[in-house]
Amino acid sequence: MNIAKFCIRHKVTTLLAVIMIAVFGVVYTTQLQMALLPNIEYPAAYVYCYYNGAGPEDIEQLVTRPLESAIMSVPGVDSVTSSSADSISTIQIMYVENTDVDIAATKLREKFDALSLPDGCGSPVILNINVSEMMPSAIVGLLGDDLAALQQQAENVVAPALERIDGVASVSVSGGVERQITVTLDAQRAAGYGLSTSYITQILQAENLLYPAGEVYNGSQKLSVTTDAQLSTVDEVANINIPLQTGGTVRLGEVADVAFETSDRDAIAAMDGTPGIILQVSKRSGANEVKTAEAVVAAMEELAAKDGSIHYAIPYVASEYINVAVDAALEGIILGVVLAALVVWLFLRRGGATMTIAVSMPVCILAVFVLMYVCDLTLNMMSLGGIAMGVGMIVDNSIIVLENIYRWASEGHDRMTSCVEGTKEVTLSLTASTLTTVAVFLPLGLTGGIAGQIFKDFCLTIAFLILGSLAVAVTLVPLLCYFLLDESKVHLDALQRAQKGGRRAQKLMDWYVKKLDYYVHHLKRGVLVSVALVAVFLAACLNTKMVLLPEMDEGMVTVTVSMPIGSKVEQAAAMAERVAAIAEETIPELASYYYTADSGQSASLVLNLTDKGERDRSATDIANALRDATYDVAGCEITCSAYDMGAMMGGSGVSVNITGEDYTTLKMIADDLTAQIAAIPGAVDVSSTVAEQVPQVKVTADRQACSQYGLTAYSVAAAVRSGLTGTTATTVTIDNKEVDVVVRGDGRAEESLDALRSMAISTPTGGSVPLGSIADVSVVMSPQTITRYNQSRQVTISGDAADGDTSAMAKSIRAILAGYTLPGGYTAELAGGYTEMMENFSDLGLALIVSVGLVYFVLASQFESFVMPVIIMMILPIAFAGALFALPLTGKDLSMISLVSLIMLAGTVVNASIVLVDYIKQRRDRGETREEAILHACPLRIRPVLMTTLTTILALVPTALGMTGKMNEMMSDMGTTMIAGMLVSTVITLLFTPVYYCVIDDLTHHRERRKAQKPAAAQSKP
């Protein structure tokens, strides 16, 4: 049964169904979760393991190598990159595609539990990467001068309150100081009693316990027995009696200074110059980021109102960014709807027609919100971007049906006939064009890597829109036309006036018919002109630079301050403060800043800029200016860059990985290549992971000498570590808070090498021996950081391009590597964000090829012809070339977004060709010649073609102009290329699709004639 006829005859049912969809759409829109980005799970994880006091080589040997061996035995691991530095091993794991990272993490924990890591080494921490959750939901700064009090306030009051919020996964605290009980051993007194730090540590552990002893009966009642010997005050610790090897005891306070004090600072934080503590609030997976962030703000306001001592600031809250982005995207969608409806009114000059379109578009969008809720999608930049990009497309089907209904009515048919037959006549071409458009999104949504995850929501929403538009066009539009169509006013003269639109429109139509007639009768010239256009367009964009994602001005500049080895955390913080002062002097757009110095070797500074509309410079320009302003700052290495989501989605810049075993050789190669890469014009922030080797003290135990005193290499190493670094012996509870008890030497051994050699090492017999008598204490050169790749040592050179053109920079680096002779056993290859970009480009290129193939398949199935799809798709090369031509004209780069827009064009620009070719075929079936059919069909179809093109283009204008959100640069590139491709393809379709039709028609007839001539020639032979 005809769908349009069914809907008109069942008006009430149809309208109630539409109303129900609209109501559900409104309800579900308010229940959809909002996020900045889709859930992007990178197939990677990080492993961190701390071993305080160990140097890079010790970390590599004792921690990194065992962890690497365990990791490589886990199924699904593709590559392992590790970094061994002072006190920490950092390992990046890359999994093969489609690996379940949660299951892999469980297997990693099982492997790690079976390892025997050194005493004092922390447990490995596994962190899976989720790009959408890498940024915290909120950053809270507690301000004040008493850092110990702030630390207690943060840990006892603020952090617990924030962790109780529904949706909060964790709250990390940095920048404060911890209180601890420090037992500082007097070396001379301890040696006199034959005491060592390790022995005192054992006694403290034995004296501080809560031990279950069993059960006893009190009559018929069974009671549990617990031995309680817990320490709870500093005096109790100081008064512990230490048994001596020679008999008797000595009070701990007599051989050591026992004090309740703050620990050494391992992190410093400040906001706008005011010292404080930084709390990073992370949401749990699946939680509503906006509600979570807003709840954090509300909780802080409530805490401050209850406790006047809480002074805080919130430099970052995700809800502000997301709300602004979502609101702007929705405004862009509404504006697109209005502009599309305006086009309909300008062409048809009918209030009923305009109202039909104005009603059908919101119904489609509300239906999409229902499907988004069902499919558990979020309102994010990509899903809203899909709606914004599809607003113009959803009206295309309705316009074609509407225009055809009006044409039937203008020919004198009644309302029922006009609505039913007018819809039926174009249903085939509508279905074909809709399926081709949807088909292109299938391979895009199934693309692997980051590209597939980024565009999954985008593809689903736009596919929902387009399929919904087809349903609305063949059901709701004919029904609304049946209600709103006024037969008395829709007569031929009125329609002709609307169609001609005055003298200027008639002149344009006459010009079009004249050109069309010319090219139809001069096919070779038409083909040559179209080929020349493709060549010109492609030649103009040959020098377009390539980037992974368009630069997104998010209003933040990040600065990394790298300090020399051995620097204290206070020095790193002071340098960060100095850079912040320079920023305050040179950047008028600076709104606020905060920094954290988490180790003595680096500090991270974040500059928050004023809103984009309030400044003339981009975040990248400001970062470049700050880089120049800090160029002369001595004593550290400063890296400045605009905060870029693209870097989080795959890195940025270009890297060179050099692999080999000998560190000295690696350093030599890296130094040579770093100098050459830094000399590339436009190269900035060029550095390598190799650094100057620094002196390190190495203690090598003499096993024979140790055995004479009853010592082992391990007991000597433990004694040296305890004397220099200190050992956490136990924990005590003071004021309901666990406090570490740290045993350490008095610091004399740290003063010089001779003092270290003189350190007294206690023996099992109660005596002591100088360290220098049982071990060799010498100075050796050691690297600051040791990097490994797949269990081989590696050095990485990284850099970026000042203008972002990493493709040109990579080309220059390739030339350098090609001319560089490497020693045997060493390799150097490109890596970094550039290789990630090329992999994603390759995936999208394959998706484009598959999309074109699917378009052909759909068209061939729809028209039951192998030839007609070729005619229709001849427009694609010119559309692609025209879209790329727009990039250099508008100052944009070739990015992953640009390639996605080409894939979209593959399914959209053919729609006009489908309408033309289908109608030409219909007229030829009615008996017209080829030329007559073309010259009659094309002018009649020019209005729906122009209407659909203009509605799509105007609906994309807000996106192209950057009116769809705070990070509008991403969708702006897509809007620009789509508009350019649509403009070029429409003009070419109207002029040259008939040419291609004639050429292929001639070739088909020529082949048929040759086939017919062969049997005739065979029969004529004697």
Identify the role of each PLM range.
Residues 6, 37, 45-48, 90, ...:
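Extracytoplasmic/periplasmic membrane-proximal domains and adjacent transmembrane bundles
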Residues 1-34, 424-426, 497-550, 607, ...:
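Signature of alpha-helical transmembrane segments and their immediate interfacial
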Residues 322, 326, 402, 407-435, ...:
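Helix-loop junctions and hydrophobic alpha-helical segments within the transmembrane domains
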Residues 34-45, 81-87, 121-144, 172-178, ...:
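Flexible hinge/switch segments at interdomain interfaces of large molecular machines
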Residues 25-30, 35, 46, 338-407, ...:
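Hydrophobic transmembrane alpha-helices and their membrane-interface caps
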Residues 12, 19-55, 113-120, 165, ...:
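Transmembrane helices with small-residue packing motifs
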